[in-house]
Amino acid sequence: MRAIQSSAFKVLAVLIFIGVIAAGMISLQRSHVESSATAVENVYDYYNIIDSASVEKKSADELFSLYRKSGVTSLAVYDETPEKLVNHDYLRIYRGSEFAFRNPTAQGISDSKIYIQPVLNAEGNAYFKETKEYLSLLMSSDDVRSFDVNGVETLEVNAVYNKFMQMELGIYAETVKNAASHGFYVVLRPGNEAHVTKDYVDLFLKKLDASDRVSAVIFQGKEVLGYKEYVNYLSHELSRRHIPIALIEAQNQLGFEKQSGNLDMAVSSDYQVVRLYAMSKDELIKLDPKEAASRYYISDIERNIRMNLFPSFKFPLDGMTLSETNASYIADVSSRLEGHGFTVGKASVMESYFPPSILRSIAMAGALSLVVMTTLLLFPPLGRYVWVLEILGLAVTQGLFWGLHSLMVLQLLALGAAVCTPVVVVSLFLNYCLKRKDKAFAEIGWGKLFVESLLILWISGILSLAGAAFVSGLLGDIRFLLEMQIFRGVKLTFVLPLLLISIVYIQKFPFFGQTVSSDKDFIRFVKKFCGVQIRLGLLVGLGILAVVGYVFIGRSGNNGAPVPGFEIALRRFLENVMYARPREKEFLFGHPAVLLAMTALYRKWPQILHYFLIVAVTIGQGSMVETFAHMRSPYVLSFIRGLDGLAAGSLSMIAALIGVMILVRLTRFFGERYGKL
């Protein structure tokens, strides 16, 4: 109580307020960058459409029209292989014995060699020419020979037939032009070659220049094209052509798929990159089309994904052909995106945004003041050293920021703000509880209790959103928006606030008959706590806490515990009816606990119950702040998610009020019955 009333606390509050304004200004600038990049590119495999036409009794043009109407904007073109070139009737490739049989007059044919000829039309000749071009770079000159057979140019290749047929040659200009001719953008998917040469990289760029419809490059394999020596060169050439690199989001949604050189290339290109979501075929076959569409839609709106790479279902569904099945779920994604204010087209590339250093510096000072304020609440005797802590902290953090341009200091202060915000907010709530604890429930009544709890919830929520601005502002640059850098310490933001608010609580409310106000009191508290007799009821309670802890901690992050089906259904419902789905632990758990905590205070329920309800309130407020730690999520979406959580929590509070009223009446009824026995 004394800490909150001190002059130091008030000065720190002013410094925090100034820091919040600076962090808020950065967040608004960041929001403008995000809201200016709302075009999502839908990509599908070019050859998948070509190959499906014959087996579905459709022309290729009919299927291209089907996918165009579904919202597919771009066709993915991969490195050609000899096998694909034969399958699509561009080349003829023979084993030596077969070629000799077909050309008995030809001289010098070896059974161990491979022979390549074009299909005798303009397209075949073009593909043959490109194949010759690639083989001259990828194979030794001793292993490739060109000669005429009956007036047809022929390539003789010294290689093992089966391995050669699977050999990745490269991107073909003819394929790029063919894909673009159907009215789509083209996304190139090159792989790297061992000991890649500059000539090979230049040849790729030549193929890229074959069409002005190339919209992006998605590297495939474990390395980007040109790794290691020509990464910067290729990055520069792509930037010069204004062609972005697509980084594939990792399956666990943390960072990107492992690919040597991709992040270096992104930095070298001044962050001309887009985030791409790709679902594996193994994952897709486990889902129905509606759920698959929801996964893509949520990824786009919640994680700054601006390119979708769609796989094909394995089997057709609902009486449709396989192409119709695929087009159906892609159309669902496109429709929902457009309904949410996005456009479907060439992927937007975010501005390479870095906030003004002075604003960031002020936000850092505010976040530091928040940490110092929390220290003051936890350890009131340190109040005499508060300005020493503040000045020392400013010297260290500002020195690291301005002198070394340290990224770690930003991450540490963001973590500090995320941990300390719910602690300070709930400490203020506890201070209010202290002022009201002597009030009798008869003076309040259910109606006033609800209104009071509702006001407390919204005031607390607004303060938490203000504190969350520090996380958004301190980490608000393009590296974090693309998730090339991340918020560090997510698990700590769940656990530490609960431990810290417990320390604050035992200083304000009596456990075992007295509060903790000194070191001796704390030691006495620990001894009494360790001496508590363990009974069956306590074991049951600890079991319930263990389950809650598993759900709360285990379900956090991206690799959390599995989510049951009914909860997935609830999430999908909320996604459809609200702008941003609120978190269950906020509106079903933490926010209603405000009313229950006030009820426990006024009705003089056991102190331990009031404590656990305060912990629940802390979880709710902490979750609101932790939402902003996911920097890939747009700022506006995170902010509205918090407001939606408060709105849904207000409704849950009504349910909690009704439940408590029923419980009180039942308790009174059975208590009176028991008294008459």
Give names to the regions the model predicted.
Residues 2-22, 365-677:
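Alpha-helical transmembrane segments of integral membrane proteins
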Residues 3, 8, 13, 22-23, ...:
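A sequence-composition feature that detects small, non-aromatic residues
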